[in-house]
């Protein structure tokens, strides 16, 4: 008998065909198929094609199913294993962990509960129904634990809100002002105890709404909080001083009422950090502690001199426009001495002279300055000659006067006379 060895045959067409086009199974390496019988786009014979026959494909799928069944059985066995619980005498520290323990204890079977007593020996709990807690009692315990967890979260949120409110209050506090060495200014009397005004009081809300209305009514090209005289009041770029007339407001806190002045020429609206410690008669502007300008001042005129180490402090009643203009001052100011009446704003004449709230900047010699005596002598000469100084800036003029021009109780600060200034818009040529 002669044995005929069959060659590879394509599973699709059943013929040998082109043996070069046969592709063998990657799993059994026995079954084959033609490249052109796969039903895919033509591929060169040199490229490798991955193909698995039907028999190998079915066997692999069956093995995968068996593996999945084995993993499922292993998971079920691990769930059915007895759980070990440690006895705890202390109260639950974290409500979330307590809720998890309650759930796990409720899901256990009676014969699977194993505990440790105080001596560390394992004790098997009785399988009686009396020793096993009911599911209803477990659910009630779980609800109690969840309620304690919610209460803990609510308390944490309330504490965070309180901390945020404290931070906001500390930010809204008034800026520090220069401390008075003698603890009193000349001529101060009848100091009233400070009255606290809560942030939620209606009076504060009305004050803030009035500030916003007044600030919105300003034109963008106006230099607000700057002193203007009658000559420049006709131009649209200069606000009238009459619009800064003093208005009284009543602040109620409990059964106490205090009347305060809004401020006249220096600022249209007082800052929200206005201290409420003095009545309207004795309430005065104070220089803010941190100077906004520090530099050299050269004086030209009858008393020519140069003073170094001069500092300027913004008034506590000054508006944001004063801060903006003062912060743009150069390190060297050139001042010209002129007769006071020549540069005296007409608004001061109409309102009976300047008040402490008319001050925009306070000028003092710094503690490091060596020209303190020169500064004091300049103030004395300006008082005797009834003089003033003018510094020409880009968009405004800085007018400087002696403290003698203010009310008597504002003449000195730390027993020293000083200079104070206001900003005045520059006149633009009409032609």
Curated annotation (Swiss-Prot):
Zn(2+) 2 binds at residues 25, 28, 53, 56. Disruption phenotype: No obvious developmental defects. Plants missing all PHD finger-containing proteins (e.g. PHD1, PAIPP2/PHD2, AIPP2/PHD3, PHD4, PHD5 and PHD6) exhibit an increased expression of flowering genes leading to an early flowering phenotype under long-day conditions as well as growth retardation. It comes from the Eukaryota. Residues 205-221 have a biased composition (Basic and acidic residues). Residues 160-171 have a biased composition (Basic residues). One of its GO terms (molecular function) is histone reader activity. A zinc finger (PHD-type) spans 7-59. Residues 191-202 have a biased composition (Low complexity). Zn(2+) 1 binds at residues 10, 13, 34, 37. Residues 125-221 are annotated as: Disordered. The keyword Transcription regulation applies. One of its GO terms (biological process) is negative regulation of transcription elongation by RNA polymerase II. Residues 128-139 have a biased composition (Polar residues). Keywords: Metal-binding, Transcription, Transcription regulation, Zinc, Zinc-finger. InterPro entries: AIPP2-like_SPOC, PHD1-3/5-6, Znf_FYVE_PHD, Znf_PHD, Znf_PHD-finger, Znf_RING/FYVE/PHD. PANTHER family: CHROMATIN REGULATOR PHD FAMILY-RELATED, PTHR33304. Interacts directly with AIPP3/BDT1. Together with AIPP3/BDT1, cooperates to form a BAH-PHD bivalent histone reader complex able to read histone H3 lysine 27 trimethylation (H3K27me3) histone marks in order to regulate transcription, especially to prevent early flowering; promotes AIPP3/BDT1 binding to H3K27me3. This is PHD finger-containing protein 1. It comes from Arabidopsis thaliana (Mouse-ear cress).
């Amino acid at each position: 008998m002669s044995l005929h060895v069959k060659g590879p045959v394509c599973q699709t067409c059943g013929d040998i065909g082109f043996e070069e086009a046969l592709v063998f199974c990657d799993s059994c390496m026995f079954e084959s198929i033609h490249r052109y019988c796969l039903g895919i786009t033509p591929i060169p014979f040199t490229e490798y094609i991955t193909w698995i026959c039907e028999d190998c494909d079915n066997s692999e799928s069956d093995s995968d199913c068996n593996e999945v069944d084995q993993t499922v059985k292993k998971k079920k066995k691990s769930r059915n294993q007895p759980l070990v619980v440690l006895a705890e005498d202390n109260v639950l520290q974290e409500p979330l962990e307590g809720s998890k323990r309650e759930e796990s204890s409720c899901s256990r079977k009676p014969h699977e509960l194993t505990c440790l007593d105080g001596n560390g020996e394992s004790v098997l709990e009785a399988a009686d129904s009396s020793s096993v807690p009911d599911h209803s009692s477990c659910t009630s315990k779980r609800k109690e634990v969840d309620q304690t967890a919610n209460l803990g979260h609510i308390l944490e949120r309330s504490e965070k809100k309180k901390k945020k409110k404290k931070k906001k209050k500390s930010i809204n506090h008034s800026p520090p002002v220069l401390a008075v060495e003698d603890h009193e200014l000349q001529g101060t009397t009848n100091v009233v105890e400070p009255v606290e005004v809560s942030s939620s009081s209606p009076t504060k809300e009305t004050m803030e709404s009035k500030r916003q209305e007044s600030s919105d009514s300003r034109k963008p090209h106006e230099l607000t909080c700057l002193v203007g005289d009658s000559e420049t009041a006709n131009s649209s770029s200069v606000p009238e001083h009459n619009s800064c007339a003093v208005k009284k407001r009543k602040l109620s806190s409990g059964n106490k009422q205090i009347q305060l002045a809004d401020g006249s020429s220096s600022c249209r609206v007082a800052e929200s950090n206005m201290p409420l410690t003095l009545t309207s008669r004795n309430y005065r502007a104070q220089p803010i502690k941190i100077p906004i300008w520090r530099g050299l001042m050269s004086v030209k005129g009858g008393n020519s001199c140069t003073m170094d180490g001069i500092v300027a402090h913004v008034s506590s009643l000054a508006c944001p426009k004063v801060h903006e203009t003062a912060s743009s001052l150069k390190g060297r100011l050139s001042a010209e001495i002129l007769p006071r009446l020549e540069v005296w704003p007409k608004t001061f004449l109409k309102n009976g002279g300047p008040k402490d709230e008319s001050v925009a900047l306070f000028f003092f010699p710094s503690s490091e300055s060596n020209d303190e005596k020169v500064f004091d002598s300049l103030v004395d000469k300006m008082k005797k000659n009834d003089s003033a100084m003018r510094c020409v800036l880009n968009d405004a003029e800085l007018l400087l006067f002696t403290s003698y021009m203010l009310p008597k109780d504002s003449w000195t600060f730390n027993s020293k006379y000083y200079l104070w200034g206001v900003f005045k818009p520059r006149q633009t040529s009409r032609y």
